[in-house]
Design a protein with these regions (language model features):
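Extended redox/cofactor-interaction regions of prokaryotic respiratory oxidoreductases
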Residues: 1-24, 30, 37, 128-182
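Acidic/glycine-enriched edge-of-secondary-structure segments
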Residues: 69-88, 111, 164-181
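Conserved active-site and cofactor/substrate-binding residues in soluble primary-metabolism enzymes
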Residues: 62, 66, 88-91, 121-129
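Short glycine-rich or small-residue beta-strand-to-loop segments that form or flank ligand, phosphate
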Residues: 3-5, 106-117, 127
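Glycine-rich phosphate/diphosphate-binding loops that line cofactor/substrate pockets in enzymes
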Residues: 1-2, 92-107, 134
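Short, structured patches in soluble enzyme cores that scaffold and shape functional sites
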Residues: 7, 43, 110-112, 146
Length: 182
C-alpha cells in the first residue's frame, strides 16, 4: 500500500509501469487499486511523476546517500541531531520513516537518478540496507527501474550463478563484486 519512486520518472521513462505494476492494479490485498495506495516520490526536481505523487520529497542533488542513511537511522530508532538532511527536514523524514514502518507492504523503485551519481553504488547500497531494515516491521521490497535494452535476463543469470545482483567482473576467472569499481 506504499509505493516509493527514488530518482525515477516512470511517467516518462516507463509510461505504463504505474498503470500495470505498481500504483493502479487492483489485487487481493489492495482491491481498490490507486485509492488504496500512497505514492511518494524522491527527486531533485519536479517531474511528471512528482505531479502524480501524494508526497513529493525534493532532495538536494547528490544527497541520496545521506537522506537514505538518515531514514535508515530513524527506522532503527536512532535520533538525528541535525535539523535537516539533504534539504529535507528531520520532521519530514521522521514522518516518512513512520509511514514506511507502519504500511502493510511497501516497495522502493529506484532509477538512474540514484544509481548514476558520483557515488551511485553507495546510494543503491543504502537503499537496499534500508529495505532490509524495514523488513523487521513489514514487507518491503526494492526494485530497480530497468533501462532501455532491458538487462533483466543477464541480471537473473548473474544472480543465479554468482550470488551477486549486478556489477560482476569475471576477468580473473571467478566472480568479483564491486559496484564502485566495475
Amino acid at each position: 500500500d506504499l509505493v516509493i519512486y527514488w530518482g525515477a520518472n516512470p511517467a516518462v521513462s516507463h509510461p505504463r509501469h504505474m498503470e500495470r505494476y505498481s500504483l493502479e492494479p487492483r489485487g487481493q490485498f489492495v482491491p481498490e487499486g490507486r485509492a488504496g495506495r500512497k505514492l511518494v516520490v524522491f527527486d531533485i526536481q519536479e517531474t511528471p511523476t512528482t505531479a502524480l505523487a501524494d508526497d513529493f520529497v525534493r532532495i538536494r542533488p547528490s544527497s541520496d546517500f545521506e537522506v537514505l542513511w538518515a531514514l535508515r537511522a530513524l527506522v532503527l530508532g536512532v535520533p538525528l541531531r541535525a535539523k535537516e538532511v539533504g534539504g529535507v527536514s528531520v520532521e519530514k523524514l521522521t514522518a516518512l520513516a513512520e509511514q514506511m514502518t507502519t504500511c502493510r507492504s511497501g516497495v522502493l523503485f529506484f532509477g538512474r537518478g540514484l544509481s548514476l551519481g558520483r557515488n551511485g553504488h553507495a546510494g543503491v547500497e543504502a537503499l537496499l540496507r534500508l529495505t532490509r531494515d524495514l523488513n523487521a516491521y513489514t514487507r518491503f521490497y526494492a526494485r530497480r527501474m530497468r533501462i532501455y535494452g532491458d538487462v533483466a535476463g543477464a541480471d537473473s543469470v548473474l544472480g543465479w550463478q554468482t550470488g551477486y545482483p549486478f556489477s560482476v567482473n569475471m576477468a580473473r576467472g571467478y566472480p568479483r563484486y564491486n559496484p564502485g569499481e566495475y
